[in-house]
């Protein structure tokens, strides 16, 4: 059974698309219609206010003029994002009880970038690379940005990064789903004691990579032996405080269904999904690699923005919960 295991060589079949879980979703009351488009400034204002030179580390600066232009475009405050979909609240049923006071709703934005590994191009000598097994050889490949609607083919190698919009503690949960709508057991795949030493605290602009670049396998291999396997459901949770009853282990661990269901019922909200109009195919940057490797390093105003933005309407002071799917291409 495919799982998102980082420390051992397993295979995963996936394609990142938008979804509604196969259960009865509750609609948020009085949710305003979504904006048809946004700019990266809507997201970047969540980051620390200091704005260093785009290439704070000289070793990150590319030699190619085209590459420099591409990276500069990723940090442009006027970068445009188009609305892809609105996801209903993942609550399994409407709330049966009326709150004592009318809840206050706020909007927060989570950044996600999906990456597909490939050999580096001649003008990408600055791009960080990952060791890849190609037959009996080991090669160094880089990763290129792809949109949330990308359909990955069998054998693609994929990663994703998550940028936090707030200070708190981040958790990433995964479970399989199948063509008949059934789902597998959920697993907590981040944090573990092997990732960042178990430290899952994040601040505005913190970038988290999955899988970690220092893992035995720093990518997911898109492949499956099950014909009824349809993909993976991923849930990102950022809580103001550490979640109770979560004891970290060296590897990912199973999470009780009732725990995930309670999170969905308590924290689920309407999610608007936006993909950038540009940036597809641009290789991983040294700035992003530096941000994921240094826990105290946050992305700042003029540094690369994510390829996909999830705009979430949630109740004030509650954990942020963002769902997305890794869909398998039909065989």
Predicted regions and their residues:
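N-terminal secretory signal peptides that target proteins for export/translocation
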Residues: 1-7
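Secretory-pathway glycoprotein ectodomains that are cysteine- and/or Ser/Thr/Pro-rich
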Residues: 25-331
